[in-house]
């Protein structure tokens, strides 16, 4: 067996006396891919910040050995010089700069006199991408011209340009399509063959199974186990992550589906940059009380734009005829939708869901502050009581309600956004990618909440790129493709293949509106 490239022993990191890491061990060998698994808030990101130099030597206890010698890093530059490079979930690219300029950002090649040697950066960038078998990227184009999948590949090229010996991938496929994820996994396998080691952090355990040789599980800041992937099952990893077995991820129970509550007809959204192009083209559908309506389709199909238009949040021009309980609605802004009884948890939690500077509690009550106001003054005691009730109901884990929401894990941020929308007491709740970047324990809690709301008569619209999630939750499934409605299926024996087949099959024109008659 080869000698370890990296050894972390007994890593302890505390914040205000509270241990975020408590004696964590991690070993990585050359050419090995180690899966790092744990619930949100388990300490994965904190451990990687210790390793990558974000938390410099001296701010934590324990030992890190790199290539057999102690690693003493005062910052990220030191670890990158050693060959440790992290690719964060939120990509660190400058959209306006070219691909080549991004690949060499901070490591620019200069000519005598200090001018950048752009031609040489282009040549080397092309060679890097060629080496990765990536031929669909023009390195002279701005990064903004490429989608999330290509940008992830650009980040990998940027890391290899820094001569990475250990690549840390933090939720690398969270915004990728299935095809883009396959390309990513192929590249990870290729890097392993070249001797590059990887730490692969992901809640998608099928990806961990596909590329990882070893899995290290941490829970509540402590090391639980390190075992070869060949000896593990997905259920075993989940049990180690959450400390219990999750026997039924989708706890479906019979629930009554009532009359139509929301009807949307002829929804059309024009592209923000190119108004002649339609992102959503004449889509009509209805949802009933107590119904869980799944919305599936390929990435970029127009699902999010469709939901934004209904909620009054689409940034471009849109038209729609919306009726609530049979009455026409004029929705020009999210505030109109919330007043009418429609709430939405957005896809991009960080950009559209939370106010990072505010505390957890104030994020929860943000949409309903009027409820706690008397003569222009907020009743702080009543507000705090509501905050604590919602935090307890949704198991939002935070030391106190005034903790900045940005310091919480993704799963707890998502539950806080859900709490805010539930405080509005909606008749219709739109959930756009509700479990993206959320660990399996938090997923199970969100699924239980969805079924509980359906039993109470709330109409739920769940947009998801995870087809098992759609099939596990939905009573009925809409399929969107290239802005069109391409299928409306009752979820009775429905398969992933049927959904994908509908997504890839152009709709007959004109689109037939969905009937709103009662069953």
Curated annotation (Swiss-Prot):
Family matches, as SMART domains: AAA
Residues given in the record as ATP binding sites: 38-45
Catalytic function, reaction form: D-xylose(out) + ATP + H2O = D-xylose(in) + ADP + phosphate + H(+)
Transmembrane helix found in the keyword field: no
Location(s), subcellular: Cell inner membrane
Coiled coil: none
Any one Gene Ontology molecular-function term assigned to this protein's record: ABC-type D-xylose transporter activity
One cellular component (GO) term of this entry: plasma membrane
EC numbers, comma separated: 7.5.2.10
Name assigned to this protein: Xylose import ATP-binding protein XylG
Gene: xylG
Oligomeric form and interacting partners: The complex is composed of two ATP-binding proteins (XylG), two transmembrane proteins (XylH) and a solute-binding protein (XylF).
Function statement: Part of the ABC transporter complex XylFGH involved in xylose import. Responsible for energy coupling to the transport system.
InterPro entries registered for this protein in UniProt: AAA+_ATPase (IPR003593), ABC_carbohydrate_import_ATPase (IPR050107), ABC_transporter-like_ATP-bd (IPR003439), ABC_transporter-like_CS (IPR017871), ABC_transptr_XylG (IPR013455), P-loop_NTPase (IPR027417)
Keywords attached to this entry: ATP-binding, Cell inner membrane, Cell membrane, Membrane, Nucleotide-binding, Repeat, Sugar transport, Translocase, Transport
Keyword Glycoprotein annotated: no
Originating organism: Burkholderia ambifaria (strain ATCC BAA-244 / DSM 16087 / CCUG 44356 / LMG 19182 / AMMD)
Ranges for domain ABC transporter: 6-245, 262-507
Membrane topology category: Peripheral membrane protein
Similarity section: Belongs to the ABC transporter superfamily. Xylose importer (TC 3.A.1.2.4) family.
SUPFAM superfamilies linked: P-loop containing nucleoside triphosphate hydrolases
Entry-linked Pfam families: ABC_tran
């Amino acid at each position: 067996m080869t000698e370890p490239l990296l050894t972390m022993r007994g890593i302890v990191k505390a914040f205000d006396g509270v241990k975020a890491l408590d004696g964590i061990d991690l070993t990585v060998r050359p050419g090995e891919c180690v899966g790092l698994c744990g619930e949100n808030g388990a300490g994965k990101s904190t451990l990687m910040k210790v390793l990558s130099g974000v938390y410099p030597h001296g701010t934590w206890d324990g030992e890190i050995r790199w290539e057999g010698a102690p690693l003493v890093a005062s910052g990220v530059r030191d670890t990158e010089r050693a060959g440790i490079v992290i690719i964060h979930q939120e990509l660190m690219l400058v959209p306006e700069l070219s691909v080549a300029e991004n690949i060499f950002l901070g490591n620019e090649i200069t000519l005598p006199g200090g001018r950048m040697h752009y031609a040489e950066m282009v040549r080397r960038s092309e060679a890097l991408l060629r080496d990765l078998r990536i031929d669909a990227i023009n390195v002279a184009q701005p990064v903004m011209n490429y989608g999330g999948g290509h940008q992830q590949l650009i980040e990998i090229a940027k890391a290899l340009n820094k001569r990475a010996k250990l690549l840390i991938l933090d939720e690398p496929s969270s915004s990728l399509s299935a095809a883009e994820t396959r390309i990513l996994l192929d590249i990870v396998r290729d890097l392993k063959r070249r001797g590059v080691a990887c730490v692969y952090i992901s809640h998608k355990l099928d990806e961990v199974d596909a590329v990882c040789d070893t899995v290290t599980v941490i829970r509540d800041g402590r090391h639980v186990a390190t075992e070869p992937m060949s000896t593990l099952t997905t259920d075993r990893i989940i049990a180690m992550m959450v400390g219990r077995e999750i026997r039924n991820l989708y706890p479906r129970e019979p629930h009554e589906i009532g009359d139509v509550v929301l009807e949307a007809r002829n929804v059309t959204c024009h592209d923000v940059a190119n108004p002649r192009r339609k992102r959503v083209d004449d889509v009509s559908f209805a949802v009933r009380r107590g119904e869980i309506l799944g919305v599936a389709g390929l990435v970029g199909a127009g699902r999010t734009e469709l939901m934004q238009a209904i909620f009054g949040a689409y940034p471009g021009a849109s038209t729609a005829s919306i009726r609530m309980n049979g009455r026409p609605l004029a929705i020009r802004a999210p505030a109109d939708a919330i007043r009418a009884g429609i709430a939405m948890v957005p896809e991009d939690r960080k950009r559209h869901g939370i106010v990072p500077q505010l505390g957890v509690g104030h994020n929860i009550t943000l949409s309903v502050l009027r409820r706690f106001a008397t003569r222009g003054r907020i009743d702080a005691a009543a507000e705090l009581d509501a905050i604590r009730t919602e935090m307890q109901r949704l198991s939002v884990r935070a030391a106190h309600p005034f903790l900045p929401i940005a310091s919480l894990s993704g799963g707890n941020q998502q539950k806080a956004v859900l709490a805010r929308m539930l405080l509005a007491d909606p008749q219709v709740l739109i959930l756009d990618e509700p479990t993206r970047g959320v660990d399996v324990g938090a997923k199970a809690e969100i699924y239980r909440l969805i079924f509980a709301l359906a039993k109470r008569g709330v109409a739920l619209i769940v947009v998801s790129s995870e087809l098992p999630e759609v099939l596990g939750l939905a009573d009925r499934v809409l399929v969107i493709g290239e802005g069109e409605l391409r299928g409306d299926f009752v979820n009775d024996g429905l398969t992933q293949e049927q959904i994908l087949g509908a997504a890839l099959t152009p709709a007959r024109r004109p689109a037939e509106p969905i009937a709103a008659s009662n069953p």
